[in-house]
Amino acid sequence: MKMKKVLAILLAGAMTFGLMACSGSDSKETDSKDTAAKSDEKLTIWAWDESFNIKAANEAKEIYAEKNPDVEVEVVTMAQDDIVAKLNTSLSSGSYDGLPDIVLIEDYRIQGYLNAYQDDFSDLSDIASAGDFAEYKTGVNQIDGKIYGVPFDSGVAAMFYRTDLIEEAGYTQDDMNDLTWDKYIEIGKAVKEKTGKAMLTLDPSDLGQIRMMLQSAGAWYTDADGKVDIADNQALKDAITTYKNLVDAGITKTTSDWDQFVGAFNNGEVASVPTGCWISPSVMKAEDQSGKWAVAAFPKMAENPDSVNASSIGGAGWYVLKNVGHEDTAKEFLKETFASNIDLMNQLAADINLVSTLKASSEAENYSKGVEFYGGQEIFGDFAEWTNEVPSVNYGENTYAIEDMMTEAVQAVMGGADMDKTLTDYQTQVEAAVAQ
């Protein structure tokens, strides 16, 4: 099996199966059959994360049911790895039994699916317009000019920071706006000196920071055509250099898992958290720190002219599996909910801290409300603004496979290896791996 198929299996989400039964045949068979078909119709949705994606799907289900009470919608919780395995086992064999009508798929994974199994996904161009969503989100779900997914959550990057620690170090909130990484390191050194706190956490096995730096410059591990782009990737070189500068400045705290990461800022061990907007609920768990946090735009790499104060990490979209049997109804469900419903987006902002990539959501009531924990800052409005500034990149088919290899390359450079030679070597290795 070619590497493309293998990586599609490893790098995507999955889908489950819904049944539609039709019955009835008496003297008034036309009306009877139509009613029976409608009342027996069932959609199945697969997603992961009970507190976020599943809750969103269930709230969408409730809204859809108001106008479509005869369509049953089942929302199924599955681990993302299980979704990946089940979807690809079925798609690779051409068997659709047990698959859902609608599935949530991560942005980093979808290109692998669409390139390998395009004919198995429904064209959603008639229910979702690219202009209605943040450009970087629709850039990942299109093939041949057709939109195959309804964008969902924004993973827009931001700089969460402790205002009290920044001020103790002699800086103001204005100093945190329009940051460059050089300025950030300068502030971090002062924070370390004045407070004894680290500025941020870094996990050597997770290249999330480099990924965000890359996208801030409109770059990735692959170029616009999806080809491996490592050896001559100036944005990648700038990102690795910035990463090394952070470590060399002595302002980082090393973590190795999620609990350590969250514990570091909840316990007041770091002064800032540069990551996706989805971290906000975790930051807010430290209720004793209410009023001591603010949010600024993600820093840019000053040495790279393409880098901006906006990036992304994570995010997903909703997709319809065409051959399960309820394509039209599944598309109608998405059209009436995630593709257009501002009331739903407004409610999800309150219930799960969703930052929607539907542009019109920025006009929703909850997006202009101040959040007490962040000193009254209208964080959803800021997130929405930054979301629309995120550069669009081609994530390619193999992001995670490439990054597994690049982790070794980054650590080699951190250990003193020549960057140009290291990246040239890894260009060859990665090209060989994805060509198999």
Question: Model segments located where?
Answer:
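Short, low-complexity disordered leader/linker segments with a strong preference
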Residues: 1-44, 66, 421-424, 428-436
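Short, well-ordered beta-strand elements
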Residues: 38-50, 71-76, 101-102, 148, ...
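Mature extracytoplasmic/periplasmic domains
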Residues: 63, 119, 281, 316-400
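Extracytoplasmic "Venus flytrap"/periplasmic binding protein-like
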Residues: 63-135, 168-170, 269-272, 286-287
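Extracytoplasmic/periplasmic substrate-recognition and gating elements
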Residues: 93, 169, 245-251, 286-353, ...
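Hinge/lid segment of periplasmic solute-binding proteins
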Residues: 104-158, 183-187, 212-214, 294-298, ...
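Extracytoplasmic/periplasmic solute-binding protein
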Residues: 144-152, 157, 167, 182-229, ...
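Glycine-centered hinge/linker elements that transmit conformational signals in sensory
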Residues: 186-190, 226-255, 298
